[in-house]
Amino acid sequence: VSDTARKPNHQKKVVTVLEPEDEYTHEPDEAENYNESMYLNAFDAAQEVGGWFRLGNRVNEGYAEMTVCVYLPGGRVGFDYGRPHIDTNDKMEAGGLSIEVVEPFKHLKVRYEGKVCLLDEPGQMADPRTAFKENPWVECEVDLDYRGVSPMYGGKPQYEDGTELEVEAEKSFAKAHYEQHCAVTGTIRVGEETIDMDGLGLRDKSWGPRYWQALSWYRWLPMTFSKDFAMMISIVGGKPGGMVLEGDEYHIIRDCNIESDWDEDTYQTAMRCSVTTDHDTYEVTGEVISLIPLRNRRQDPDGNELFTRITEAMTRFECRGEKGIGMSEYLDQIVDGTPVGPDVRGTRSHPRP
């Protein structure tokens, strides 16, 4: 037995590990809320169009979370969400959406064949039942190739001797997570409209127990300016994080601040970010182009209704005179009708679910 193995966990060194096989699915934990999810976004800055696609396998609960969101010209959004049945975690394919790893860390494919709800006013999705009922559904086809333009960021934290960190399933959001900026080519068709995509984006993957209520709030800003200048800025419960891509190297964000503007629904409309790495400092401004509000609800063991709001906005960014595009994704738990994020400023309470 090594000296490291004899040490109590609190004295062991934690390292982050990422292997090519992590791009594929894992053997699920026993936790009921085990989640293995892949998310990919793509944007064309010149056209100010794009979208994001997510599959979250919850095989121990018997379903996948499947989301397709396409940002169209003029602020319109094509959107679908479903919980298709799954009984295996062997692949990322459900509800018409598939994510294929062609070559780990280098090349992935995203395909979707199905329908999306076409929203002229995406804010209607605050009441999804009504929005899905009152807006038209149109055919949608997605065929995109993602090729990495950056190193990998993140992985699975574990002790240096290879033993796993203990994760409390009820309070977990993920036990492993990584991200990568990508170049994206292909097509997105919504109804009679076709987007020829030659743009940039970011992808991520997580696995491990997840409840959407495990985090009280976060602000997540993935953005791209070019193939060799991009960022992911995050504040999770007050803790700064993320990275800046300069050339072919990631520089870890050591500190950041995000100051946001809000509308009467307490949805973000713009933001100003200060970012510090070991090498440089950056000032970034963002302006929301199109936003759709989403939610997740569940009951805790005591029967209390828990309500999570996630506002998903295609956002134009500017830094050092360079124009870029990406997302501003803001997650808040809603308590007594109010988002809990300490930065939220607005006038309207949200009705209890």
Question: Model features per residue range: what roles?
Answer:
Residues 2-353:
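Structured soluble/peripheral alpha/beta segments that form catalytic or ligand/cofactor-binding pockets
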